[in-house]
Amino acid sequence: MQAVNYENETSYGNLELLAQQVVEGFITGLHKSPFHGFSVEFAEHRQYNNGDNVKNIDWKLYAKTDKLYSKRFEEETNLRCQFVIDVSSSMYFPEPKNNKLIFSIQAAASLMYLLKKQRDAFGLSLFTDEILLNSPAKSTTLHQKYLFTQLEELLHKPKVNAQTNLSEALHQVAELIHKRSLVIVFSDLFNTQTSIDKTDEFFDALQHLKFNKHEVVVFNVVDKSKEVDFNFENRPYQFIDMETGETIKVHTNQVKENYTAAVSSYRQQIALKCAQYKIDLIDADMNDGFYPVLQSYLIKRQKLG
């Protein structure tokens, strides 16, 4: 599912409806995929462990799957998840009504809906070069409505002229949130590319999160066709840095080879370091829709138990 045009959509209910449709479609699709059986566990069950009360085993589900699952109860909260979303200027690329920020908001809302369905707790942090919002993780319906309202308002705000300070934001989040949380970051990692120092600062912040016993998933949100593959018409362009306002005039055919090589090298460097520090780095091409994001979360959630 692609990102949705929000020009005429203004209420909390529209984002919730989108999230519901995405999650229900995803869960339905699991029955036709290698993840068959996970969807039921995600919604209302968890895998049975030795020592669990046998009265809570769902024997009908056992008959279907040949696996033991316990029914979840309303008060159960097994996971605390903090969503950290980059809302700086570069996230408004490539266009006002279909950009990385809209994709990130809709993807995060879908994950929140899934977490609520699992009765897990979730919070939200929004940042540019500073923390704009930090809401702690809760699992109530009222809390979900509050966060969805915050995200809806963000969808309709005009573009901000703000640079990114991802490293500082992650340092603050590491100290503000409950220990042993799952931290899910949506960012284009724009400012980590500007220098080696910025890249090092980014990984210092990730290590801070790991030191505080958090698990970390970074969704590197991109418009792959343009930002990675540099697929533009072969003609002169004026490119504008969305965070600094700096401009440069180039003929795309003359710079494409060097540009794609530099981007590929940088992405490989980030991937290797994330693997070294046991950080889950996931490419999130906004043109691929939300299901890859949900599937990556599902895999991570299964590893966490």
Where are these regions (language model features)?
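A positional/architectural concept
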Residues: 35-39
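Short hydrophobic/aromatic beta-strand or adjacent loop that forms the aromatic wall/cage
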Residues: 42
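Exposed, interaction-prone extracellular/peripheral surfaces
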Residues: 1-28, 47-52, 61, 70-106, ...
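N-terminal low-complexity, intrinsically disordered segments
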Residues: 55-65
